Structures are given as structure tokens and as C-alpha cells.
């Protein structure tokens, strides 16, 4: 778009429907372009081009279309895409979903203005995810190890304590190493006012805000803002990682609300729906978010992602968790059964998986026994869980002494490894030591996945 076109104001709004308006008789307009809108009473609003064809543009109005009409509304196309001003001073601040301060502080003086959609990254310029990120939570650090540059979602359900877990991870997460800088970018989408107050209070009172940038989009905010929020958060993370050399953990919650916003906008545009009414491009859209995690050659910093989503009706085959699973490198699954038992965090390690766990385990990263002892504990816990079904049929008296030891191990594993205080920050060494303590419950001859050398070195003597 040339300078002349940027000054043209259009009054040719032909239709307004929901959050969308259609402008006729335009030319030289591009997809994603930002639009300045003047309402009939002179107020200013902002929009974005969602569709441009022939001489028609479909514009999503960020603040909604109330009070707009087809005769007096004025529109000016800016020629720019959606950008955010970023700065190191964003650390310790809370913003709304559009990047405006929510904490009463001043506007950020931008060091750079970056496109919120990021920039295409040549796969050849990526380094494989590597090195351990410690969350202080045993069921993540021990069994589903998080690695710098990885993307691993948390699959939750309505009413499960994923918000509490998200703030605990944000508070406790760290990288191990001298002089390594670490930050958290936290983005909440479509949350209630109560949840917003909870997040802000938790970040402020625990001191976690000092190393964090927080973005909050409320449920009554426009749907298009919900689409922008994770992109703004990821752009901020990329700036801190690749420009400032920091290791950044991005926590996105709740991606289900994000996908509902995608569906709402697609319906307003009369698009042909895909599975369960979601747009057919939802997979591509989610990939545009998740694939912004990683490590880049020649840059010190990394971007690691933990997206959190609530599975509708606890259905892991629902399109949102299903498509997420295709893109990401594993999943951490929260269990309603464990939650009913009063276990926090209710992480079910059997369906959970970190495909890159091996990249962050072992000597020089965690400890030399990590992968072997966790493999042994995982196998023993799985066998103990299976025996519970048998006990429900034949009773515990019918079990052999060996089977009873595995049953006891499964109960102890849930009570001492899975169960953890909301303020309990465990180092990986503490987690592994707890696991070795539990392995004393099993007969020595059943420890087939750990070497005699490791047993002599780490297994406590009875």
C-alpha cells in the first residue's frame, strides 16, 4: 500500500454482522492489515482484515461493532500488520490481551516493534531441544522431563486444578547453570474475573512476577483479542529469548477458549465448518502457535512452551487435544480419579509422555540414574495399578506376596511422588531420591531395569 492509500477514508461499509463488517470498493488491501475505524460519534476503534478479495474486505473489529452503522462509519486501512512494542522492561508487568498495561503502570517504551505473527523460521536453522528445565514438580521433572525448546501440553478437564498447577510451574520453573537468565511469559485467554484476580494475586504475592510477563484476556473481551493474545505473548517470548539471550518458558491457558474464539469468528464469516463445528484450518492455526517454540542456531536463548487446555467432557479424542497431540512433543494428562482422591497435582503418568525426555536426562543434565530408575518406577507403578482391578474382583487375600509389594508400591508412589504441596519445590535430586526410597518396597530381584552398580550407589539399605 502506498502513502496515498494510507490517507484514504472509506465510508462504503455495506454490512455489519456480529464482530465483522464488510467494506466495498477498496483496492490494494492485504490480509492481516490493521484498520483504523471511526464510529458515528467520533470514537476510535481498531480492526484487522480477515479476508480481502476483488474490491471487498472483511474486517474484524477488536472492540465489537456496537454503535457502528453502514452510513456514518469511517474506515482507514493503515498498511501495517498487527505489531507489539517490546522491551526488557516488560518483565514484572501485567498486560491485557492486546498488550495494554493492566497493573496501573505506564505504557512500555518500545525498544522494537515486532509483528505478532513472528517470522518464518528455516527448519535447518533450528537446534534440537536440549537441556533440562526444572519445574519443581516430581511428575514432570522425573517422569515427563521438560527440555529447553520443547512444546508439551497439559490436558486437563473442567474443575481440575490446572490453574493452580500453572501458577506453581510459573513460580518454580528454572534452568540449571551458572549465569543462565530465565523468564516466564504467562498468557491466560477467555478466563473469568475471578480467575484473573487469582492469577494476578498469585504472581504478586509470591514474587514470581519479577521474572514474568503476564497477559490476561477475559471471557467478556472480544473474540479477536483472544486470537491475538497468544501471538503477542509468543512475540514477547521470542524477543526476550533471541534478542536478550534468555531462556523463556511460555505458559498458555486455556487453549480451548482460544479454539472456541476461532470457531466463533469462523461462524460469523459463514465458513464451512469442520469437525464439531471448528474451522478446517484449526490444525494449521494451532501449529502456527506451537511451532514458535524451539532453539535457534547462533542464539543463546530458547523458547519452551506449556500450553494448557481443558478437554470438553474429558474427551481426549476431541479435536482440540487430538490436533494438539499431532503437533506437540508429548502430553501431561490430569486425572479426575486422582483428583477425587485428594491428590495434587493429579498428574496421571501412564497416559502422559514427554517424547524428548531423554534429551534432558542423564549425567551433566540431571543425574546418571535418572532414566533407569524412572523406567523401573514407571513399570512397577503400571503393574500395581493393574493389580487394583484384580483386587476388586478376587480380593487382596488372593494375591501373592510379590503382587502385594507392587500394590503397595503403587499406593506409595501416588502418596509420596505424585502428591506434592502447592508450595513444595522439589529439586530433581530430591525426586530421584524419593523414587529410590520407594523401590525398597519391592523385592531386590524385581529391580530388573536398573544396573547393580546403580543399586549399590543409590538404593537405601534396609
Curated annotation (Swiss-Prot):
This is A-type ATP synthase subunit B. PANTHER family: V-TYPE PROTON ATPASE SUBUNIT B. One of its GO terms (biological process) is proton motive force-driven plasma membrane ATP synthesis. It comes from Methanococcus maripaludis (strain C7 / ATCC BAA-1331). Gene3D superfamilies: 3.40.50.12240. Component of the A-type ATP synthase that produces ATP from ADP in the presence of a proton gradient across the membrane. The B chain is a regulatory subunit. One of its GO terms (cellular component) is plasma membrane. Has multiple subunits with at least A(3), B(3), C, D, E, F, H, I and proteolipid K(x). SUPFAM superfamilies: C-terminal domain of alpha and beta subunits of F1 ATP synthase (SSF47917), P-loop containing nucleoside triphosphate hydrolases (SSF52540). It is a peripheral membrane protein. Belongs to the ATPase alpha/beta chains family. InterPro entries: ATP-synt_VA_C (IPR055190), ATPase_a/bsu_AS (IPR020003), ATPase_F1/V1/A1_a/bsu_N (IPR004100), ATPase_F1/V1/A1_a/bsu_nucl-bd (IPR000194), P-loop_NTPase (IPR027417), V-ATPase_su_B/beta (IPR022879). One of its GO terms (molecular function) is ATP binding. Keywords: ATP synthesis, Cell membrane, Hydrogen ion transport, Ion transport, Membrane, Transport. It is found in: Cell membrane.
